[in-house]
Regions:
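Short aromatic-glycine-(Arg/Gly/Cys) micro-motifs in beta-strand/loop hairpins
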Residues: 20-48
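N-terminal acidic leader/helix
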Residues: 4-21, 25
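Short intrinsically disordered terminal tails
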Residues: 1, 77-80
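A short, exposed loop/beta-hairpin motif centered on an aromatic-Gly-Thr core
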Residues: 44-61
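Hydrophobic beta-strand residues in large extracellular and virion-surface proteins
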Residues: 9, 21-22, 33-35, 53, ...
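Short arginine-rich
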Residues: 66-76
């Protein structure tokens, strides 16, 4: 796979600690959302996915829905 173009990164935090980082990368033929999840009792982040989509629109929709869920759960989500 060739180097992709990073489209955006979203960083979710709750109570001053990282909860998740979502990164969308466009590879031309597909768009991939890479995620890092920070469990409460873990010393390091866990990787979930990657989640592969046909285009940036689908990847953006996935991240938008994930961000909405994180906000509903009380997280602050910011562009990173």
């Amino acid at each position: 796979m060739t180097a992709g173009k990073e489209l955006f990164v979203r960083h979710a935090r709750k109570d001053c600690r990282s909860v998740a980082i979502l990164r969308a990368v466009d590879y031309g033929q597909e768009c991939v959302v890479e995620t890092e999840v920070f469990p409460p009792d873990a010393a390091t982040a866990m990787r979930a996915g990657p989640y592969t989509f046909a285009d940036a629109r689908q990847a953006t929709q996935f991240v938008t829905e994930a961000v909405e869920a994180l906000m509903y759960l009380g997280c602050d989500v910011h562009a990173a």
